[in-house]
Every structure is written in structure tokens, then in C-alpha cells.
Amino acid sequence: MPLHNLTRFPRLEFIGAPTPLEYLPRFSDYLGREIFIKRDDVTPMAMGGNKLRKLEFLAADALREGADTLITAGAIQSNHVRQTAAVAAKLGLHCVALLENPIGTTAENYLTNGNRLLLDLFNTQIEMCDALTDPNAQLEELATRVEAQGFRPYVIPVGGSNALGALGYVESALEIAQQCEGAVNISSVVVASGSAGTHAGLAVGLEHLMPESELIGVTVSRSVADQLPKVVNLQQAIAKELELTASAEILLWDDYFAPGYGVPNDEGMEAVKLLARLEGILLDPVYTGKAMAGLIDGISQKRFKDEGPILFIHTGGAPALFAYHPHV
């Protein structure tokens, strides 16, 4: 088993049982293609989401280092920050969140509802900044200030997307391969590609476990030219940690995120409504709605390698629906 080195890394178990991998019969009929969905939106903390897989490794490392504070950064409506704050609460740690308003809105729901509301419930210390122009440097500067106040901070990068956090999605690839074995031969896997850890972790894992399946990242914030090096660098860093080779080509589609990160578009919102009405499953306006718009258009434009079954990775994010109301 090529991924045996995963067990070398300390890991807290927040998720327990594998998340469901489900067939979508009504959605499949609508699109004329077999569509399956990996339900990482139903991980069991703080309204679910993919970041919990990364936090199993990152929080374990924080405890190993003797930290009493988790520090991270993101947008006001960051799913990652919400899940980090929940993990901190569960472990009895302080959480400091450096937040930006990337869409420059004054809409009350965006500023106070959705994920931002949940941060207050988790007793998160909020620090606002004008923009996360250099988040790694800004997080280190914040950590220095927090340390000067007598805390022992552990910095978690935006999205939990470093090599250690991304191991959570190598682990997820193992889970997916086990769920598909003997049941379905997945031709293509579609995932939202943002901070790149989920995409890169899946790329490393699926290359070794399901090499016949193509993995497509639908970008939510950047062009292919800007996103590709982020994913490739993480892919190689993960492979180095696991003492593996990673030579799979990284495939990205950047046609679906305009006008920009965190700004809903018509195609993404149509995808949100479609899955809700056909399957009772909630996507979000920022990540999964746009990724699903890519899947839908990819079928109509014949962009996939063949007409075999497609697996959509549902990374969560439904709390943002409340933040973006009445625009959804």
C-alpha cells in the first residue's frame, strides 16, 4: 500500500466514520451522466466541511508543540476559519482569526451572519485587516503579538493548505478508493480549487490509488496561470513528506469563478438551486456552486476524458448561503 507513510503523522480523530459517497439519481437523469457525490459537507463539527480533514493533522501538531492558541486567516465568511474556531473550542484552545472583507461589501448579512455569526459562538478573537496581501507574513506578525501577550500560538495557513494539512486529502483519496472498489469505476473527479490543499492532497492520493481517474480542479479565485504553481508546489511538498513520487498532471478549469473570489455568479447560483431542487443537497455561492457549474458545463462541452461516471467532492460551505442572502 503506497500510502503507508500517512500513519507516521500524529492525527486527531474528529470525523470518525467515512463520509458518505452517494449516487445522485435525479441529478444524473437531468444531466444524462452518472454523477456521484462525496459528502464532506457532513463532517460532524460546526456544520461540516472539508477543512476538518486538514485540522485532524494540524491540530495534532499544535498540541504536540504545546500550543494553547490557534491562529489563522481568511475572509469574513471563511469556512476554514469557522472550522478552525470550532476545533479550538473542542480542544480548549484560544482562537485568533485575522479576517478580510475581500468583496468590499457593507451588506449586514455578509458582515454578521453565516460563518461570521458562528465565530462569535465559538468565542473567537477577531482581528480585521484591510486585505490579506501576504497572509503568511501577516499571520507571523500576529503570532508575534499574541506570543508577547503570554500565549503559545500555532499558525495555521489560509485554508489549512500546507503539506501537513493536505495529508487530510491524501487520506480522503484512500477513503474514496475504498468506497468505490467493486462498486463504481469513476472516470473523473471534480473539486473546487482555492487554497489548493484539498486539490493537491487528492492529486497525490488518487494518482496512486485510482490512476485511471482524471482529477479536475475548478478554480474559485485565480486563473490557471496563477493557480497551477500553487497546486503543483503543494503536490510536490506532500509527496516529499510521504516519500512518494507525484507526476500526475494537474488539470484546472478557470472559466467559472468570474467576476472574482467570493462574488456569486449566475452559473454558480443556478447550480446551487439545481442540486437543492433535485437532490435536497445544499451547495454554496463561493466554492461548490462554481465547481458544480464547471461540472455541468464540462458535460455539455464534452470537456471530460470520456462519458463515464463523475464524482463531485462536496467540500461544504452552506453557512455562506445565509451570509449572501438576499443575493442567493
Swiss-Prot record:
GO terms for cellular component: cytosol. Coiled coil: none annotated. It is an enzyme of class 4 (lyase). It catalyses: D-cysteine + H2O = hydrogen sulfide + pyruvate + NH4(+) + H(+). Optimum pH is 9.0. Its cofactor is pyridoxal 5'-phosphate. GO terms for biological process: cellular response to sulfur starvation; D-amino acid metabolic process; D-cysteine catabolic process; sulfur compound metabolic process; sulfur utilization. Optimum temperature is 45 degrees Celsius. It holds the Pfam family PALP. CDD domains: ACCD. The modification N6-(pyridoxal phosphate)lysine is found at residue 51. Keywords: Lyase, Pyridoxal phosphate, Stress response. Disulfide bonds: none annotated. Catalyzes the alpha,beta-elimination reaction of D-cysteine and of several D-cysteine derivatives. It could be a defense mechanism against D-cysteine. Can also catalyze the degradation of 3-chloro-D-alanine. Belongs to the ACC deaminase/D-cysteine desulfhydrase family. This is D-cysteine desulfhydrase. The gene is dcyD.
